[in-house]
Design a protein with these regions (language model features):
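Glycine-rich phosphate-binding "P-loop"
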Residues: 81-91, 110-115
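Short, compositionally biased "basic patch" segments
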Residues: 66-77, 90-102
């Protein structure tokens, strides 16, 4: 874990994610709303990921609080827009590692860090604590895609599987929905770095669990099928036509958020069918969710068991 001193120092004038907000997170919070302290909203066994990620038992997912994006439709908005640390959240490396260890005892062989882009330094210290305990699970980096290539380079040899999202092929849409500039160029550069490290192959073990590779996710947004088709084409043309792509249909307007226009409604069958047809025509490898998935993936992070409510 020789990377740790370098990443800890980046929090003094934060450059961990592409915003490079410059905050001293040792004395305050960054644009993400998080200080140098780890803030984990949930550690749980999760079976809802892609088959080679979940495996037969499930993956131990570590859900970081805060986020470097502000997506208007965020399904995890209860934790991504954290203002107050909730009593059941974890804020010490010992407590986080204890919870992960409990999951691993239940049979999980991989740990997925969800929304890690702004807590990479903390993530590495969690991994170091696991290694100190003699635990060496596979590490999955499950991000929104708005990652710093410089930070990702420090993760080479630490992360086994990258699982980023690629949300937009349209910067105007990215700004309107996620409040971010230059998403397309930034996310494409991050994906290029992940691809440099992993290539297009997905290496599976004897249990059909991903041990090494890259899977890119794309969530289809209602009323924005042109964005989805453009995103798939961009992935094939600028990264690789042999990428493993997970096409997601689980969009729903989250409770508690005020959304206007098409984002206020579910995805329609004809919209998803149009994107799925393009996906199949391009010959991309991967997985496509059923449209009904929107009825099942509705976590409640006010509960200590967010996926069991």
């Amino acid at each position: 874990m020789s990377h740790l001193p370098n990443l800890d120092s980046t929090l003094e004038h934060c450059t961990v994610c592409p915003h490079q907000c410059g905050a001293n997170r040792h004395v305050g919070v960054g644009r993400c709303g998080v200080s140098a302290q780890p803030v984990v909203a949930s550690v749980c066994l999760h079976r809802g990921e892609e088959p080679p990620i979940s495996g037969a038992v499930g993956i131990c997912n570590v859900f970081f609080a805060g986020c470097n994006l502000r997506c208007a439709f965020c399904q995890n908005h209860q934790i991504s827009r954290c203002g107050t640390v909730q009593p059941h959240w974890l804020t010490t490396y010992s407590d986080i590692a204890n919870s992960i260890e409990t999951c691993l005892r239940q049979g999980a062989t991989a740990v997925g860090f969800v929304s890690p882009s702004h807590q990479v330094a903390q993530m590495l210290r969690i991994v170091a604590e696991l290694h100190r305990r003699g635990l060496h699970p596979r590490i999955v980096y499950n991000s929104n895609g708005f990652d710093s290539p410089q930070t990702l380079r420090l993760l080479e040899g630490v992360v086994d599987v990258y699982l980023p999202a690629f949300k937009y092929a349209d910067n105007a849409l990215a700004h309107a929905c996620s409040g971010v500039e230059h998403y397309v160029e930034t996310a494409t550069a991050a994906l290029a770095e992940m691809y440099r490290q992993k290539g297009a192959s997905l290496v599976l073990n004897d249990n059909d669990e991903a041990e090494f590779g890259l899977i890119v996710r794309h969530l289809v947004l209602p009323g924005h099928i042109d964005n989805s088709i453009a995103a798939l084409r961009l992935l094939a043309e600028r990264i690789s036509p042999r990428l493993h792509v997970s096409l997601m249909a689980q969009y729903y307007p989250p409770d508690g958020l005020s959304l206007g226009g098409d984002l206020a409604r579910p995805l329609r069958e004809n919209e998803y069918a149009a994107v799925l047809a393009e996906y199949n025509a391009m010959g991309l490898r991967g997985w496509a969710q059923e449209l009904s998935s929107a009825q099942h993936y509705r976590p409640n992070f006010e509960s200590e068991s967010p996926f069991n409510t």
